[in-house]
Amino acid sequence: MKVIVCGTTFGQFYMEAIKKFPEKFEFAGIYAGGSDRSKMCANSYGVPLYTNFDDIPNDIDIACIVIRSGALGGKGTEIALKFMERGVNVIQEQPVHYKDIAICVKSAMKNKVFFKTGDLYVHLPEIKRLIDTVKEIEKHQNICLLY
């Protein structure tokens, strides 16, 4: 399956995941603003960097949207919708406002594609450690509130 990653800050986690499964995924490119970081990532992974949405090939199977969602002042949701209109399945990284999720789910159904919000955070070592710690505390006492 051909995969494109949109965004290169947190998107690098997705790039590494794609790289680990070359038998399942073909890293088809990066869609980003053209910063030095995005150029460096494209060069490092040996994939094209697209800065214009219309230049992205039409044979992409999955788009990983790792750009701020509309609720956070970014264009992630807008980009997700554009991909789904093209018939591309979308994984959009959190946080995504529930209204944006509803819009994306409707678009996915209309365009007969899949839409999923990412859950990469729960797999990060620090978050796993926090979850394990909270579970251990819960064995000994009830937790009323976490800050």
Task: Pin down the residues of each PLM region.
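General small-molecule cofactor/ligand-binding pocket signal
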Residues: A28, Y50, K116
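Short, surface-exposed connector motifs at secondary-structure boundaries
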Residues: F21-K24, E85-V90, N111-F114
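Short catalytic-loop micro-motif centered on adjacent basic/acidic residues
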Residues: V5, V90-E93, F115-G118
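N-terminal Rossmann-like dinucleotide-binding module
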Residues: M1-Y45
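A short helix-to-beta-strand connector/capping loop
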Residues: A42-P48, K110-F115
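Beta-loop-alpha module in the N-terminal Rossmann-like domain of NAD(P)-dependent dehydrogenases
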Residues: P48-S107
